[in-house]
């Protein structure tokens, strides 16, 4: 993965690695950071380097450390075991019905848990994985898709926005049989568009839900339910369990009642690492993950995400969902970008719309929609909404003012 020099330096200081796997053309500023002593071997277009640093003690089952999509710029890592990774790969292969005839193409970095899971689940079943370094906006990528008879495409919500602009639904791709989506909630209209197209053309469209802390998959929406349950994250993956709990930790059994989503399964990581000593720790989570997502379950057992637990604020005693506020604004002003942050009685809206008139229109619209005073909505212009490589908004970069 491409890592900023200051973060790389911090990671090296924190975790004291003995080996480094780096590209041949690593920037000079990065070379100065790496404590390189000798080259162990060259692999494709990369080098495996060894330093004299004595590495930290490792827990016997620790297999992999991955950054979470929400911790860009942070040394906090997820501690995954071999069992976590293998169990999740098996489960994904089961519900996607992956066989050795599948031909996926790499579209996401392997350092991203979604990208890793695609490789692992297909490799487990002996499928052929097409390696591509081309951006999906290039003609070279789509030529490769056609030439290699690629059978599945994957993407985060932003990818599907690009698919829509590129008119994927009008392309001649006879070998394409499966689409999968994860990495954030897909806007309802895109879910509907690709769901209808897949059903009408005999393809399968899987909307999925996961977090790096679960290696990463926890739920999927069966393709035959894609329209009936449009907007849903689906049901638990094979071998996993999902439930909702209230603020007191009691399980919620009534349908259409919002609570925190809790997952249990063998793919749940051992915990986080924030320093070298954490790498020697045993399993702290014991197969249970409190996702931090607020959701509801319908009477048929299908789950729907409504927002992040930390993305709710109180405004004059009313509970306001910041994620819902963003969705309302995106629907009302479809050509603009929005990000909402806030604290009690203050809701800040960052938008790519520039004029004061547009900002007044935003405040008035929210006041009418939420029945809250317009003065609680503070609207600010921003050139672009800050996003991480997974396409998720970096709220930590937005000031509450």
Outline where the language-model segments fall.
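Structural core segment of the AMP-binding/adenylate-forming
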Residues: 1-56, 353-355
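Conserved pre-ATP/AMP-binding loop-to-beta segment of ANL
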Residues: 45-67, 74, 97-103
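Conserved AMP-binding A3 loop
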Residues: 63-90
């Amino acid at each position: 993965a491409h890592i900023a020099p200051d973060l790389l330096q911090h990671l090296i200081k924190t975790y004291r690695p003995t080996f480094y796997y780096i590209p041949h053309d690593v920037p000079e500023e990065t070379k100065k950071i790496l404590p390189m002593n000798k080259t162990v071997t060259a692999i494709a277009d990369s080098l495996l380097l060894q330093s004299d640093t004595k590495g930290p003690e490792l827990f016997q089952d620790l297999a992999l450390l991955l950054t979470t999509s929400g911790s860009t710029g942070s040394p906090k890592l997820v501690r995954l075991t071999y069992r976590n990774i293998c169990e999740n790969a098996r489960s994904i292969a089961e519900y996607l019905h992956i066989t050795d005839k599948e031909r996926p193409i790499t579209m996401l970095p392997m350092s991203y848990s979604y990208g890793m899971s695609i490789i692992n689940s297909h490799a487990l079943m002996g499928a052929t994985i097409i390696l591509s370094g081309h951006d999906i906006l290039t003609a070279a990528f789509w030529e490769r898709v056609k030439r290699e008879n690629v059978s599945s495409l994957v993407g985060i919500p932003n990818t599907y926005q690009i698919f829509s602009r590129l008119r994927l639904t009008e392309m001649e791709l006879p070998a394409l049989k499966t689409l999968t989506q994860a990495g954030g909630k897909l806007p309802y209209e895109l879910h509907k568009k690709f769901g209808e197209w897949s059903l009408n053309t005999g393809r399968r469209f899987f909307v999925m839900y996961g977090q790096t802390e679960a290696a990463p998959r926890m739920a999927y929406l069966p393709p035959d339910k894609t329209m009936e349950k449009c907007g849903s994250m689906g049901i638990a993956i094979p071998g996993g369990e999902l439930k909702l709990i209230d603020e007191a930790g009691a399980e919620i059994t009534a349908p259409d009642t919002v609570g925190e989503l809790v997952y249990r399964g063998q793919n749940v990581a051992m915990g986080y690492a924030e320093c070298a000593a954490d790498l020697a720790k045993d399993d702290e989570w014991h197969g249970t993950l409190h996702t931090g997502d607020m959701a509801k379950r319908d009477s048929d057992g299908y789950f729907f995400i409504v927002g992040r637990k930390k993305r709710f604020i109180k405004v004059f005693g009313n509970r306001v969902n910041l994620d819902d506020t963003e969705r309302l604004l995106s629907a009302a002003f479809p050509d603009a970008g929005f990000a909402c942050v806030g604290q009690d009685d203050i809701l800040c809206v960052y938008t790519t719309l520039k004029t004061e008139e547009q900002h007044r229109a935003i405040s008035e619209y929210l006041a009418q929609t939420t029945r809250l005073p317009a003065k609680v909505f503070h609207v600010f212009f921003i050139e672009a909404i800050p996003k991480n490589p997974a396409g998720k908004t970096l709220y930590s970069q937005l000031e509450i003012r």
